[in-house]
Amino acid sequence: HKEYRRQRQMCIRDRDLKAEVETVDVAGGYELPAALRMAMKARRRWDGYLLLGCVVKGETDHYTFICEAICKGVMDISVESGAPIGFGLLTVDSLAQAEARSRPDRMNKGAEAAHALVAQIALARGWGLA
């Protein structure tokens, strides 16, 4: 969470956005699409949604099914709703790979997803949609 919050603040500052952010934890990656749908149905409205997660491969094919289900669920909601969504799901073989893809000083897939979300929100605002 600490790195996520740092990246979020950088994105807001870089774009000079007036942003209010709420962080929600879910049980696991598989729950991301359902949590996204719930957030979109909530009384409170947000300009965009950032989903971050990590699935580490085990010894069975379960990993493949879970990753595909998460990605399909998020994509279906994205296409259906048209809402700005940043999506950073690490699909890795080990914790070391996850750490390498979430380093604050180099490659950071969460930061990339956050920057993509900020760009999508700016696009939606430019078209009067957010």
Stretch-by-stretch model annotation:
Residues 1-12:
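Single conserved hydrophobic/aromatic residue that forms the stacking wall/gate
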Residues 15-25:
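Short beta-strand elements in bilobed, periplasmic/extracellular small-molecule ligand-binding domains
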Residues 26, 53-55, 90-95:
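Short, ordered loop/turn segments at secondary-structure junctions
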Residues 34-74, 130:
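Glycine-rich phosphate-binding loop
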Residues 64-91:
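Short, acidic/small-residue loops that bind anionic groups at enzyme active sites
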Residues 93-108:
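Phosphate-binding/catalytic loops
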Residues 107-130:
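A charged, well-structured terminal subsegment
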